[in-house]
């Protein structure tokens, strides 16, 4: 049943049914009464004095005026200014005929009679008056002194003025026990934003002015209470709205009436003494009204007396909701300020405000206290406080109040057109206020025209007197369910704030958008229990909430009794969580633990219960209920305490017309993805919607940057490849063909395998240390003249069989390093070149790669037996192993040569220390350039041969 809506979280403001009306004085002078033993002024008869600032032609309701009144012997000078923003341009008035047909009229653009102002030379003062039928209103001098002024009945020009505390009603209360401050802090957790939100509202967005387009309704009993006078009834409702607008200005919120309706021939919905049934009946009627008259919030003023002390009822956090943005208020006072305080309180609940704790309100109880106090002040509260401001900010940050950013169009503002009033109206190009206060460089204040060259003067889509280009972002997407808005290029104002339609999936399909918010069980559990909490299994909800008692229920019914949850609605009752914390975050809340058996193991289900007074138990629903808009199953959402199919949102039907390329906004129009054009997202375009403006074209900057980077990388790779090819070609030339300074600088591209199993002809050729790393041998370079022919091997190189076997490593090393004359390399002074004039540059650091490929076949046919098999040669005693038997004294000469057209792979044929054929041998010496120079050593008795096999190889 709708009356038990768990997520609505209703708060009731309880006051007295009827205050004591101050007794009017029939004679001029003072009327005193006794209160607490001391005489005090009850009321005073005065005649206010008007002084206008207009031209000599006197207006009935001037734009600005000065009013002088006497109060307790003190003259108060009131500086008044007409509240020109009270009525929206679409303001209408509706009444009904005896047959029940509505009659709607648009009020003429006449001077209205509702003012705001201050007391001259008095800080923090405030004045709210109407001058339609005499002067009636509230004069606030300080936080503890205020006066009420009203016309004396049946008198011309005479008025009563008295202190506001003499309107004191019997005290009432609502909701929480406001003496416990922590209760409020816990309730605030419900309006905090989840940590996963992509983006929070900017501070300037929170501080910017918000606008509530209000629709007021007076029921049939209220009409009868005002003596069936339509004008009197309408005047009272407008006066109420004027008060509420003044109250909310301190929160940067303006109240603009878009419509007023009087039920002159019976009620249009069920109105009874039960506030619950009256509220849900009125909200149901209001949903039908939305199709005919757009508004943000609707309030019912009824002459019905509710049960007990209840005089107001409204859902919590419901502002802008299609289904719940509204409230019902009982007219419990003949003075409009009493009903205005009640309506401001109930609208505060719509804004997400809970009741004040004891330390929030600084206004004295004697002057009424604060509007959101749980108990009434004396006589009526008139101010909000810092706690209310913080609650409002949290609500806006969580996604609430999405409809409040758009300012009502003031081009046909009710109350008349005038250059200098600060509102752009028909016939005006701009309006920056009076000449002395205008500081807009784009606007001529004297005649409300744009200065030469200016295209605009106001609005977020106007920059330096020029309209911003179409597609310029003027309002960012604040959170998941919000939508961005873009300048149209035709208007200086940003389009109305739109958001995704209720029922649109969010949070990766784990939740649904509702009223601009995306709520999950996980978030609510963490708000109740702190970080780490998570929702309990579904079985916990089913076992606990079917009880229908204080600890497990689906809200309350029309009579205020706890309602059992049907199995399908169990996840919309008391929320069940799992947490390791000992108790909930709120000090007045206690854990309600239930243990169930699931799959053979125990599961702990943790709910919460907040202790409240007996009078509060029936006035406010449990805040531990699952919030409206929470996903309770596939295509199902919690709504009014029930798990309902999302089809009633009509999201699916609206989404089909977007052709899968967009989402529906709250105006049921498609907001297209980039690349598709509105209104149906079925043709190429830039995205956006007909409501939010066109999205900017996709920027080609990233594409161009990507192409340029790719071209640059490709060019670098090609340059590196070209350099390597050139190095390979230069490295394969003879050293004799290169300048001496460049011979060894191009040897880096040669590859040397570090693997003994490479498949070379001589697998014993290794350039590795025992640790598997190449060992660099540094020996002086052996130089020869460029004209000197390459050495030849001895003529008998190929005779006599194989060369002698190589020596063991330690003997070979000893023989090479022996200082004896037989091991020295002969050099002559004539063969030496002069030392270089400058040191030889170091070899470049080149990467030496491995080559595991098979060697190339020889380019020339090899002889039949180029290397005969080895045979042991006799060694006479004392003969050097490097000399053949019978040789004379050793007179060897070193010869270094690089075979023509030799490849790096062929250079590996020779191993350092290998004995040469017919007594010759190849050996390795170090050079200064870290190269291995394979040197052919010839014996003196042998003739050099034309061919050789010793090569210059890389280190």
Curated annotation (Swiss-Prot):
The chain crosses the membrane at residues 700-720. Residues 753-917 are annotated as: Disordered. Residues 650-682 form the EGF-like domain. Expressed in many normal organ tissues and several cancer cell lines. A motif (Cysteine switch) lies at residues 130-137. Residues 210-408 form the Peptidase M12B domain. InterPro entries: ADAM_Cys-rich, Disintegrin_CS, Disintegrin_dom, Disintegrin_dom_sf, EGF-like_dom, MetalloPept_cat_dom_sf, Peptidase_M12B, Peptidase_M12B_N. Zn(2+) binds at residues 132, 345, 349, 355. The conserved cysteine present in the cysteine-switch motif binds the catalytic zinc ion, thus inhibiting the enzyme. The dissociation of the cysteine from the zinc ion upon the activation-peptide release activates the enzyme. This is Disintegrin and metalloproteinase domain-containing protein 19. It comes from Homo sapiens (Human). The lineage of its organism: Eukaryota, Metazoa, Chordata, Craniata, Vertebrata.
């Amino acid at each position: 049943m709708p009356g038990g809506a768990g997520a609505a979280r209703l708060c009731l403001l309880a006051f007295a049914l009827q205050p004591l009306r101050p007794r009017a004085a029939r004679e001029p002078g003072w009327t005193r009464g006794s209160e607490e033993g001391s005489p005090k002024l009850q009321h005073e008869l005065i005649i206010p004095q008007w002084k206008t600032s207009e031209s000599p032609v006197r207006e009935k309701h001037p734009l600005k005026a000065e009013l002088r009144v006497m109060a307790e012997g003190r003259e108060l000078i009131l500086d008044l200014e007409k509240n020109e923003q009270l009525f929206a341009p679409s303001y209408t008035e509706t009444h009904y005929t005896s047959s029940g047909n509505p009659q709607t009229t648009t009020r003429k653009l006449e001077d209205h009679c509702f003012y705001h102002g201050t007391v001259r030379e008095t800080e923090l003062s405030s004045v709210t008056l109407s001058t339609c039928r005499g002067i009636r209103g509230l004069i606030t001098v300080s936080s503890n002194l205020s006066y009420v002024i009203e016309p004396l009945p049946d008198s011309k020009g005479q008025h009563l003025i008295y202190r506001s505390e003499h309107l004191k009603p019997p005290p009432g209360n609502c909701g929480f026990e406001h003496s416990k401050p922590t209760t409020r802090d816990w309730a605030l957790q419900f309006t905090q934003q989840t940590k996963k939100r992509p983006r929070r509202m900017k501070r300037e967005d929170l501080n910017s002015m918000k606008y509530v387009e209000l629709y007021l309704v007076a029921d049939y009993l209220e009409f009868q209470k005002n003596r069936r006078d339509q004008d009197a009834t309408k005047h009272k409702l407008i006066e109420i709205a004027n008060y509420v607008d003044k109250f909310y200005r301190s929160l940067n919120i303006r109240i603009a009436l878009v419509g007023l309706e009087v039920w002159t021939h019976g009620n249009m919905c069920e109105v009874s003494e039960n506030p619950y049934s009256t509220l849900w009946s009125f909200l149901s009627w209001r949903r039908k009204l939305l199709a005919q008259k757009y508004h943000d919030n609707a309030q019912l003023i009824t002459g019905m007396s509710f049960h007990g002390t209840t005089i107001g009822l409204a859902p919590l956090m419901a502002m802008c909701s299609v289904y719940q943005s509204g409230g019902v208020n009982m007219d419990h006072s003949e003075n409009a300020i009493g009903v205005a305080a009640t309506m401001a309180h109930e609208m505060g609940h719509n804004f997400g405000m809970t009741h004040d704790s004891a330390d929030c309100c600084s206004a004295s109880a004697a002057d009424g206290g604060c509007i959101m106090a749980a108990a009434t002040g004396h006589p009526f509260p008139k101010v909000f406080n810092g706690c209310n401001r913080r609650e409002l900010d949290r609500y806006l940050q969580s996604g609430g109040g999405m409809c409040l950013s758009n300012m009502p169009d003031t081009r046909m503002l009710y109350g008349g057109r005038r250059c200098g009033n600060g509102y752009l109206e028909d016939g005006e190009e701009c309006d920056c206020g009076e000449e002395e206060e205008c500081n807009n460089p784009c606007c001529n204040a004297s005649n409300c025209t744009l200065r030469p060259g200016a295209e605009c003067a106001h609005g977020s889509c106007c920059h330096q007197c020029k309209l911003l280009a179409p597609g310029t972002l003027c309002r960012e997407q604040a959170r998941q369910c919000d939508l961005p808005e873009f300048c149209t290029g035709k208007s200086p104002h940003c389009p109305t704030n739109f958001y995704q339609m209720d029922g649109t999936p969010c949070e990766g399909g784990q939740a649904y958008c509702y009223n601009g918010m995306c709520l999950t069980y996980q978030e609510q559990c963490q708000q109740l229990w702190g970080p780490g909490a998570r929702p309990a299994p579904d079985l916990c909800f089913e076992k606990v909430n079917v009880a229908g008692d204080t600890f497990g229920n689906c809200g309350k019914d029309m009579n205020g009794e706890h309602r059992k949850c049907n199995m399908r609605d169990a996840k919309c009752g008391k929320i069940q969580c799992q947490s390791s914390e000992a108790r909930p975050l709120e000090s007045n809340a206690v854990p309600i633990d239930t243990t169930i058996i699931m799959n053979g193991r125990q599961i702990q289900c943790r709910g919460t219960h907040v202790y409240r007074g007996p009078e509060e138990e029936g006035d406010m629903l449990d805040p531990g209920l699952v919030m409206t808009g929470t996903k309770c199953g596939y295509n199902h959402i919690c709504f009014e305490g029930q798990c309902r199919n999302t089809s009633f949102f009509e999201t699916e039907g609206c989404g089909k017309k977007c052709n899968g390329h967009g989402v529906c906004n709250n105006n049921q129009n498609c907001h297209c993805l980039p690349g598709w054009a509105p209104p149906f997202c079925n043709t190429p375009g830039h995205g956006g919607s007909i409501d939010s403006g066109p999205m900017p074209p996709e920027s080609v900057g990233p594409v161009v940057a990507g192409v340029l980077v790719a071209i640059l990388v490709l060019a670098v790779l090609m340059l590196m490849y070209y350099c390597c090819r050139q190095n390979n070609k230069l490295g394969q030339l003879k050293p004799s063909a290169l300048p001496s300074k460049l011979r060894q600088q191009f040897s880096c591209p040669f590859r040397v395998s570090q693997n003994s199993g490479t498949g070379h002809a001589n697998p014993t050729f290794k350039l590795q240390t025992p640790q598997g790393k190449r060992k660099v041998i540094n020996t002086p370079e052996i130089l020869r003249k460029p004209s000197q022919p390459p050495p030849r091997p001895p003529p008998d190189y190929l005779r006599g069989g194989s060369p002698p076997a190589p020596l063991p490593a330690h003997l070979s090393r000893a023989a090479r390093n022996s200082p004896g004359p037989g091991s020295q390399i002969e050099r002559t002074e004539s063969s030496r070149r002069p030392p270089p004039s400058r040191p030889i540059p170091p070899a470049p650091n080149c990467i030496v790669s491995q080559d595991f490929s098979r060697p190339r076949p020889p380019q020339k046919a090899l002889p039949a037996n180029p290397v005969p098999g080895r045979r042991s040669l006799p060694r006479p005693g004392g003969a050097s192993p490097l000399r053949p038997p019978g040789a004379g004294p050793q007179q060897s000469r070193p010869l270094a040569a690089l075979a023509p057209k030799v490849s790096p792979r062929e250079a590996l044929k020779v191993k350092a220390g290998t004995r040469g054929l017919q007594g010759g041998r190849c050996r390795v010496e170090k050079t200064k350039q870290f190269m291995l120079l394979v040197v052919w050593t010839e014996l003196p008795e042998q003739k050099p041969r034309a061919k050789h096999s010793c090569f210059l190889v890389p280190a």
